[in-house]
């Protein structure tokens, strides 16, 4: 029966995905016959809480309280960040649109010495999960025993090395040790599970089992590497995420192992509605008892070279997962990702530079291909702990301390470009994920012939139920540049007729751009025929419904309504087309229209990057500002980096904002439906001396500075060289392998030690025969014609970061 359903599904999708390229760049796709069977009740997953909430899992998506649910997961390792700042960092993740915090429990940190467990300080898992709960964030805990995460031995303790059993096997001696670990974890999070109305909705069992392993740290120069896997798995084990075309002679053994681990986890108290297992590259999962989560790394350090990846090409990801073949039947499970590479670590010889602008197109592609859950690895960087010069880092060329990962939020809590770009898809999924999740992906025939190097054929897909849906497009490819795609028109054939994007004329999809466009959808109960603006969020304020969209450069903002209704516009114009209103505006400008007391706001792309929805349901506002906006109970916390004056706009308009910490000047807004303010504070010049001793050494003295005056202080080194290290109190504090980006170090976590100690920075020159030169952008490569070594350090900066609180007065 299952085989017949699966074959029927493939035939159906083949019939409906009719894409034709005309003589001009026009594209057509037929979704009118879309059909896809969704199975329920076959998975040993799901559960209820003591308050009656429920989570269920079918073959296509997760349901929460009976409604489709689209989780957005961000990885943040509590053990790689100072615990006194966890709360602020979780708030940043929430502001970025994350709904589920994922984290690893690294066994070797918690049981460094056999039989002695440590759950204190930065290893206080319980406190971390409690802070997730306090911020209304769910959590998925990746409990190992093996994790990887570029950790020493992949998280396995050193003392397991050489024991008379195979690690990651069904040997009873090994499983006894794992059972002790699981029981410890279970006790730490007792009462915090979903069933208790707690935040822990999921547990990941093992990691990349029968797919990947880490090198044992106990080794010798010149010796073959030994890996943290059972010997019988060695021939299929990889150093990183990849494709296994060999199959697995021990697949049945692996499934048994995963079943044993799940039972042990449940017996230890880890009873949750969602169990996951990494499913890529033929890894073993718990058959029908776990969701096989997926990955996508476009810039992997474990593979040599700069080859364009397939992770920007649309596909039916539910039937054909990335890194296929897999060990399970994909159609039996929803497609969820755990490790979409929002960043990448580097090694001494391989240094992939990952741009924040690469994150959003990958997510648009992944969601448009049928994924019903996103998971970012890493979303928040950190610093790998050490004990003196005992390093917990995996080593073997990786950073010894820094785990910045080029992530959306970096090693020291600094938000980068990727943070702001991902906010757009995260906000869309938060508000429209329940509508999107049941919609079926339809892939055009033109996609079948696209190779990563083809940057002239439009990359697009549709998710639809045959009538309504969303058009997904992007124009990005890793490692190569993409030209603007001009004079495009995309036709979507639905059961109610053909929808053209746009109806008249054409559009341009600029290089690097990505977009999600709706058709035959209702927003605030107003029927849209189509729109060339992307939905961002929807909310209610004082009983009035608001929907917010943003425009994309290269596309005339156009909203075609389906019915003849009265439209009031501000900053836009309305025309009649085929008897229905069409609202048009200009890209780069804000405009609003109103239908039946429902308000629709269209803002430029740049404003959307810096937009935050704040407040309680029913009483919310949109804030636009280029500072970071966090919610803290009834207050807003603003984090301001390196400036003392900034602007803030609020929609819909409010009476005022209040703060005892800053000067507030009310401004006349450009659009009358906004409130606008200018905020300023007194400049603080940190009493910190940074002295250059020679061409390689800097010494920082912060003994006189009171760190309580600021939220943080960043030292910024704009340098070109091989690498740099930061030493404090005789130990390595952090390090940097040069990738072309400035090196930023936050000082607040070191404030106590800096009261009595200098901080030392040591830089080494780049050589003309360095193995990583091919990874660096041409603009940063030095001229080696006169010297075989090069080191350049521009004037370093000491930059204060402020945090202030404000309160919105709505009445």
Model region roles, listed by residue range:
Residues 41-42, 46-47, 54-56, 64, ...:
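Extended carbohydrate-recognition surfaces in non-catalytic/accessory domains of CAZymes
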Residues 706-728, 761-763:
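Aromatic-lined ligand-binding clefts that engage carbohydrates, nucleic acids, or primary amines
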Residues 65, 578, 727-733:
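Short strand-turn-strand beta-turns centered on an Asx-Gly dipeptide
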Residues 24-100, 804:
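N-terminal carbohydrate-binding accessory modules
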Residues 86-154, 158-159, 262, 266:
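Aromatic-lined substrate-binding rim segments of carbohydrate-active enzymes
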Residues 134-140, 145-311, 323-345, 371:
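Active-site region of glycoside hydrolase catalytic domains
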């Amino acid at each position: 029966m299952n085989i017949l359903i699966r074959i029927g599904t493939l035939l159906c999708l083949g019939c409906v995905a009719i894409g034709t390229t005309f003589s001009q760049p026009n594209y057509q796709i037929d979704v009118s016959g879309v059909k896809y069977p969704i199975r329920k009740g076959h998975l040993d997953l799901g559960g209820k809480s003591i308050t009656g909430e429920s989570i269920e899992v079918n073959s296509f998506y997760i349901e929460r309280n009976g409604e489709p649910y689209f989780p957005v997961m961000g990885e943040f390792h509590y053990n790689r960040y100072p615990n006194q700042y966890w709360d602020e960092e979780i708030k940043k993740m929430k502001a970025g649109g994350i709904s589920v915090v994922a984290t690893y429990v690294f066994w070797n940190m918690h049981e460094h010495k056999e039989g002695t467990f440590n759950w204190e300080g930065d290893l206080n898992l319980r406190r971390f999960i409690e802070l997730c709960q306090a911020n209304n964030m769910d959590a998925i805990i990746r409990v190992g025993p093996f994790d990887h995460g570029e950790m020493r031995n992949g998280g396995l303790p050193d003392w397991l090395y050489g024991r008379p059993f195979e690690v990651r096997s069904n040997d009873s001696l090994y499983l006894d040790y794992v059972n002790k670990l699981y029981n410890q974890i279970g006790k730490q999070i007792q009462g915090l599970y979903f069933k208790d109305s707690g935040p822990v909705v999921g547990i990941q069992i093992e990691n990349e089992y029968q797919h990947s392993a880490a090198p044992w740290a106990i080794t010798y120069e010149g010796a073959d590497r030994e890996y943290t896997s059972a010997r019988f798995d060695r021939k299929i084990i990889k150093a990183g995420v990849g494709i296994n075309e060999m199959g697995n002679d021990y697949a049945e053994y692996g499934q048994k192992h995963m079943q044993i681990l799940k039972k042990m986890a449940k017996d230890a108290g880890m009873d949750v509605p969602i169990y996951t297992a990494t499913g890529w590259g033929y890894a073993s999962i718990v058959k029908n008892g776990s969701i096989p989560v997926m990955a996508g790394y476009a810039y992997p350090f474990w593979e040599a070279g700069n080859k364009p990846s397939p992770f920007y090409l649309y596909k039916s990801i539910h039937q054909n997962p990335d890194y296929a073949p897999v060990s399970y039947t994909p159609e039996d499970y929803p497609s969820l990702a755990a490790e979409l590479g929002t960043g990448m670590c580097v090694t001494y010889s391989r240094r992939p530079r990952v741009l924040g602008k690469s994150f959003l197109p990958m997510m648009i592609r992944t969601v448009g291909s049928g994924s019903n859950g996103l998971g970012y690895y890493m979303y928040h960087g950190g610093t790998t702990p050490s004990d003196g010069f005992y390093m917990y880092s995996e080593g073997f060329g990786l950073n010894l301390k820094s785990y910045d990962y080029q992530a959306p939020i970096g090693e020291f809590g600094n938000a980068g470009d990727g943070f702001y770009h991902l906010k757009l898809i995260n906000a869309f999924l938060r508000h429209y994920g329940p509508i999107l999740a049941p919609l079926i992906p339809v892939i055009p025939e033109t996609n079948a012939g696209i190779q990563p190097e083809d940057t002239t054929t439009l990359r697009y897909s549709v998710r639809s139920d045959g009538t309504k849906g969303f058009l997904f497009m992007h124009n990005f490819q890793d490692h190569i540049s993409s030209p603007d795609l001009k004079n495009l028109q995309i036709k979507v054939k639905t059961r109610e007729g053909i929808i053209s994007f746009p109806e008249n004329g054409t559009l341009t999809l600029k290089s690097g751009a990505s977009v999600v466009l709706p058709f035959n959808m209702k927003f605030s109960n107003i029927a849209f025929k189509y729109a060339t603006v992307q939905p961002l969020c929807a909310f209610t304020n004082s009983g009035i419904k608001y929907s917010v969209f943003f425009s994309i450069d290269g596309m005339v903002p156009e909203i075609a309504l389906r019915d003849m209704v009265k439209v009031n516009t501000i900053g836009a114009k309305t025309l009649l087309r085929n008897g229905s209103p069409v609202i048009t505006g200009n890209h780069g400008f804000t405009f609003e229209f109103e239908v039946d007391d429902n308000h629709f706001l269209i803002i430029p792309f740049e404003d959307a990057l810096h937009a935050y929805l704040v407040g309680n349901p029913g009483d919310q506002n949109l804030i636009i500002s280029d500072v970071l906006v966090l919610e803290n109970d009834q207050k807003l916390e603003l984090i301001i980096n390196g400036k003392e004056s900034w602007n803030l706009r609020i929609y819909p308009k409010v009476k005022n904002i209040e703060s005892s910490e800053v000067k507030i000047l009310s401004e006349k807004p450009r659009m009358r439906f906004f409130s606008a303010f200018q905020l300023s504070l007194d400049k603080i010049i940190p009493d910190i001396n940074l002295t250059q001793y020679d061409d390689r050494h800097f010494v920082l003295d912060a003994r006189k500075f009171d760190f309580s005056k600021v939220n943080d202080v960043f030292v910024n080194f704009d340098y070109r060289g091989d690498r740099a290290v930061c030493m404090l109190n005789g130990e390595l504090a952090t390090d940097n392998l040069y990738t072309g980006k400035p090196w930023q170090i936050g000082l607040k976590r070191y404030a106590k030690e800096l009261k009595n100690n200098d901080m030392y920075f040591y830089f080494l020159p780049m050589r003309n025969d360095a193995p990583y030169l091919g990874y660096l952008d041409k603009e940063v490569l030095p001229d080696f014609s006169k010297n075989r070594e090069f080191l350049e350090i521009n004037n370093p900066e000491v930059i204060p970061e402020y945090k202030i609180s404000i309160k919105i007065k709505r009445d």
